Amino acid sequence: EDLAAVLGPKLDVSRGDLNRTSLSLQTIRLPSQAERLAWLAEQLATLQGHGIIYTLTVRDANQVAQWLKTQGFNVEAYTGETGDRREQLEQALLNNQVKALVATTALGMGYDKPDLAFVIHYQMPGSVVAYYQQVGRAGRALDSAYGVLLSGQEESDITDWFIRSAFPTRQEVADVLGALEDEPNGLSVP
């Protein structure tokens, strides 16, 4: 009813089961990055198929990918800084040419690999919605897939930084408003 009030009366509502019996979910608390890296190196060798390892930052995606490469895994980092290689890396995962992409949210909506066998979160995502969307990529066309959420101590610092950075400070807003009020002919951005 709330959505119909906002979007209008010609709204079709589809309801479905959110439960995915093919997807096994697990949370593992490993406070230090060293513990999580060791866990990844140990477990990645036992996981069948190919998948995505999500990180919160570009730095962590690069660090995790580099570590796994030193352990003999065929993985690649995929971030907002990947640039021209994005399509090539997406195709490599699609064609099972890499064990995993170690990715930030840059590997987001629109990427579809029905036989994705696992999604591992190196850190807790910023929201439940982000987690659900990312982990839901696994096992769409498989009888069995895994979603593993690794949780560590630096997450709150990263999340707090994202929250603090999301909005301008009071002083920044006051400065912009002051500049607009002081300019008799208004301001425009070139």
Residue ranges and their predicted role:
Residues 1-181:
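Helicase motor core with emphasis on the C-terminal RecA-like subdomain
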Residues 176, 183-190:
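Short acidic, hydrophobic short linear motifs in intrinsically disordered regions
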